[in-house]
């Protein structure tokens, strides 16, 4: 069974997110630094009648990178072609996509860090000079064909910016770091979602739900759906702070937004390794999770909330982790 706090997309959530997706920057809640910069770059590109410079959006899953790509296309008044790194298996796949673009269009590549190197190399000249050279045929009869491309904007999204090659990263003129959402912004998102789906929710309930949603809109919207079920069955249909606390407690989501896996990580560090330092590989084995899963899904939030510190020797549980789980902490 999937974690309810998993920030990767589940089931029918793609349809839900499309329904909730804002259309323009003025409707987009949060990520103010990224929005303010994009507003300037977009307006400048429109005034010059040029394609917007290529954009790299990076950050943990569920923070609105795909939504931002659609918003950028809407602000520019152009079409968006969407694909993902794992889907583009060979250079010919990329050429076919690029060939369909109209002047000024946006090409959005999700998980761009997963592009094969052979595909990435074709992308270099397309991004920099709007042309591609491809080989037609095989053996002695093969020949190089030069294709001019219309000016376009590539928007790449990644959860692992460190895995991008330097040549690819250098070709993005605009970068946007999507960060975990502030509590006030996430509360507003919960209230907006409830309004769109005609749910009755108090401000206190929206605030509590936002507090436990790990700074991630995708998780907040998922929890809202589950809390609505509790409100219908255990209450009068109104989502208030009492039913919200009861529902999230039953779902093993505590007041810091930690679930049983997060707590297992911290308890393992404290009980088995006296708080650390402990290596990521060792920790992963002890909690029966893949190293990459711990590093990408669990650790970022635990670090951001101050429960774990990274050191040269390994991960260390902080005094806050001890206090949160009811352990006595002593300085080493």
UniProtKB/Swiss-Prot annotation:
Q: Where does Mg(2+) bind?
A: 66
Q: Which GO terms describe its biological process?
A: DNA recombination; DNA repair
The ranges of region (Head domain (RuvB-H)) come to: 255-332
- Identify the enzyme class: hydrolase
Q: Which SUPFAM superfamilies match?
A: P-loop containing nucleoside triphosphate hydrolases (SSF52540), Winged helix' DNA-binding domain (SSF46785)
Q: List positions binding ATP.
A: 20-21, 62, 65-67, 128-130, 171, 181, 218
Superkingdom, natural source: Bacteria
Which residue intervals make up region (Small ATPAse domain (RuvB-S))?
182-252
Chief localization class?
cytoplasm
The record's EC number reads 3.6.4.-
> What SMART domains does its record include?
AAA
Localization: Cytoplasm
Which GO MF terms are attached to this record? ATP binding; ATP hydrolysis activity; four-way junction DNA binding; four-way junction helicase activity
Query: What does the UniProt entry state concerning the protein's domains?
Result: Has 3 domains, the large (RuvB-L) and small ATPase (RuvB-S) domains and the C-terminal head (RuvB-H) domain. The head domain binds DNA, while the ATPase domains jointly bind ATP, ADP or are empty depending on the state of the subunit in the translocation cycle. During a single DNA translocation step the structure of each domain remains the same, but their relative positions change.
Designated name of the protein:
Holliday junction branch migration complex subunit RuvB
Q: Which gene encodes it?
A: ruvB
């Amino acid at each position: 069974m999937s974690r309810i706090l998993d920030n990767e997309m589940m089931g029918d959530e793609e349809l839900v997110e499309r329904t909730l997706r804002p259309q323009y920057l003025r409707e987009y809640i949060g990520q103010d630094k990224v929005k303010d910069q994009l507003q300037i770059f977009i307006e400048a590109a429109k005034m010059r009648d040029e394609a917007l410079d290529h954009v790299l959006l990076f950050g943990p899953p569920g923070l609105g990178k795909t939504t931002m790509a659609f918003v950028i296309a809407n602000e520019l008044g152009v079409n968006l072609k969407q694909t993902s790194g794992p889907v583009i298996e060979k250079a010919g796949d990329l050429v076919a996509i690029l060939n369909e673009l109209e002047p000024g269009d946006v090409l959005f590549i999700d998980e761009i860090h997963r592009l094969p190197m052979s595909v990435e190399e074709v992308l270099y000249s397309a991004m920099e000079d709007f042309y591609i050279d491809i080989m037609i045929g095989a053996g002695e009869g093969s020949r190089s064909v030069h294709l001019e491309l219309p000016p376009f904007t590539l928007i790449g999204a990644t959860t692992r910016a460190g895995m991008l090659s330097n040549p690819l990263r250098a070709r993005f003129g605009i970068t946007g770091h999507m960060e975990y959402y502030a509590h006030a912004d996430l509360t507003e998102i919960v209230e907006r979602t409830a309004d769109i789906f005609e749910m009755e929710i108090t401000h206190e309930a929206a605030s509590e739900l936002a507090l436990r949603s790990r700074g991630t809109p995708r998780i907040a919207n998922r929890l809202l759906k589950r809390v609505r079920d509790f409100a219908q069955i255990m209450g009068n249909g109104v989502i208030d702070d009492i039913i919200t606390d009861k529902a999230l407690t039953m779902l093993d989501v505590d007041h810091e937004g930690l679930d049983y896996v997060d707590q297992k990580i911290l308890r393992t560090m404290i009980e088995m390794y006296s708080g650390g330092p402990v290596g990521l590989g060792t920790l992963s084995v002890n909690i029966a999770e893949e190293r990459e899963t711990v590093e990408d899904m669990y650790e970022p939030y635990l670090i951001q909330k101050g429960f774990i510190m990274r050191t040269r020797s390994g991960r260390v549980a902080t005094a806050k982790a001890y206090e949160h789980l009811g352990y006595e902490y002593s300085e080493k």
